[in-house]
Amino acid sequence: MSERLVTSNEIGIDSTNEYSLRPEKINEYIGQDKVKERLNIFIKAAQRRGEALDHVILYGPPGLGKTTLANIIANEMGGNLKITSGPAIERAGDLAAILTTLNTNDVLFIDEIHRLNRSVEEILYPAMEDYVLDIIIGKGAASKSIRLDLPKFTLIGATTRIGMLSSPLRDRFGVLCSMEYYTDEQLKEIIIRSAEILGCHITEEGAFEIAKRSRGTPRIANRLLKRVRDFAEVLYDNEITEEAAKKSLEILEVDGEGFDRIDNKILEAIIDNFNGGPVGIETLAYFVGEELDTIEDVYEPYLLQKGFIVRTPRGRMATDKAYKHLGRVRFNESKIDSKQCTLFEK
């Protein structure tokens, strides 16, 4: 397949019916209960004071609903949502052009905000603190600074790497929200809701079968639902049952853990070629046939999170959980308890 179905990053298929599947109000939003509770209080307090909501940072893995939350906040505050990203704002003038189009209570959503360059950040500081925009006109000795007033708006920054935000920028956000992976039950609710919007019939068992393979991520859950729906329409009388979901996902090469072919290939390489490890990441990438960065950034995090591999000072090792998943028997004595093993960065 040209695009990986279980990646948490956005791919082409996600744009189909994407906005129709998103909740519009905070009470419609499933999951992230702690974040939702805090934001609900902050929104109501801002409304009672007649103020803009304080600036918000949403951080956590991709696909967990940061853009959806930003849209909900804009709706609740009675403003419009303007979406951009850190890499798209190359110059200070690009940001100034966006800021000057905002109206009161609008929400400016900057995805990958950790990738803003420093010159752009400096424009943001007075805009966030004092709702003003300082513009330099002219060059050299003839240049002069002009200050423009901005409407009271809310900046929402989204990042998968909160540690990469500069301290001056991070300190200007009044609300910091950590987004967590979803439970299978929460994903089941999301899938049932999405199926209703898409007009396909799904049983609770069918929804749960998709949910448990969705890697804790709504974006993946909705993506798998769309593909299973295709199979249901052609092969299963437009009904997604547990059996229909299982067989469809088997054909799509997404197993019961949400692993695809490459995930399993990584585990097979460690166990079959290196007796369970340890094996260096460069060697592992060679055996799997993927780039080193791809292994580290795309595949490894979920395998680590689920406890199928661990990092040690000497390399990656497969856990008993990985052996069981592949139906292999461990013959050596170097058993690993993934709950007790320290995870080393490299």
UniProtKB/Swiss-Prot annotation:
This protein's name: Holliday junction branch migration complex subunit RuvB
Main location, first listed in the record: cytoplasm
Annotated Gene3D superfamilies: 1.10.8.60, P-loop containing nucleotide triphosphate hydrolases, Winged helix-like DNA-binding domain superfamily/Winged helix DNA-binding domain
Protein task: The RuvA-RuvB-RuvC complex processes Holliday junction (HJ) DNA during genetic recombination and DNA repair, while the RuvA-RuvB complex plays an important role in the rescue of blocked DNA replication forks via replication fork reversal (RFR). RuvA specifically binds to HJ cruciform DNA, conferring on it an open structure. The RuvB hexamer acts as an ATP-dependent pump, pulling dsDNA into and through the RuvAB complex. RuvB forms 2 homohexamers on either side of HJ DNA bound by 1 or 2 RuvA tetramers; 4 subunits per hexamer contact DNA at a time.
Gene encoding the protein: ruvB
One MF annotation (Gene Ontology) recorded for this entry: four-way junction helicase activity
Entry's free-text remark on domains: Has 3 domains, the large (RuvB-L) and small ATPase (RuvB-S) domains and the C-terminal head (RuvB-H) domain. The head domain binds DNA, while the ATPase domains jointly bind ATP, ADP or are empty depending on the state of the subunit in the translocation cycle. During a single DNA translocation step the structure of each domain remains the same, but their relative positions change.
EC number: 3.6.4.-
Positions of region (Large ATPase domain (RuvB-L)): 1-182
Subunit structure as annotated in this protein's UniProt entry: Homohexamer. Forms an RuvA(8)-RuvB(12)-Holliday junction (HJ) complex. HJ DNA is sandwiched between 2 RuvA tetramers; dsDNA enters through RuvA and exits via RuvB. An RuvB hexamer assembles on each DNA strand where it exits the tetramer. Each RuvB hexamer is contacted by two RuvA subunits (via domain III) on 2 adjacent RuvB subunits; this complex drives branch migration. In the full resolvosome a probable DNA-RuvA(4)-RuvB(12)-RuvC(2) complex forms which resolves the HJ.
UniProt region (Head domain (RuvB-H)), positions on chain: 256-346
Top-level lineage group: Bacteria
Single GO cellular component term: cytoplasm
Keywords attached to this entry: ATP-binding, Cytoplasm, DNA damage, DNA recombination, DNA repair, DNA-binding, Hydrolase, Nucleotide-binding
Protein residues bound to Mg(2+): 67
Family per record: Belongs to the RuvB family.
Residues binding ATP: 21-22, 63, 66-68, 129-131, 172, 182, 219
Location(s) in or outside the cell: Cytoplasm
Region described as Small ATPAse domain (RuvB-S): spans on this chain: 183-253
GO biological process assignments: DNA recombination; DNA repair
Catalytic activity: ATP + H2O = ADP + phosphate + H(+)
Enzyme class: hydrolase
CDD domains: AAA (cd00009)
A Pfam family this chain is assigned to: RuvB_N
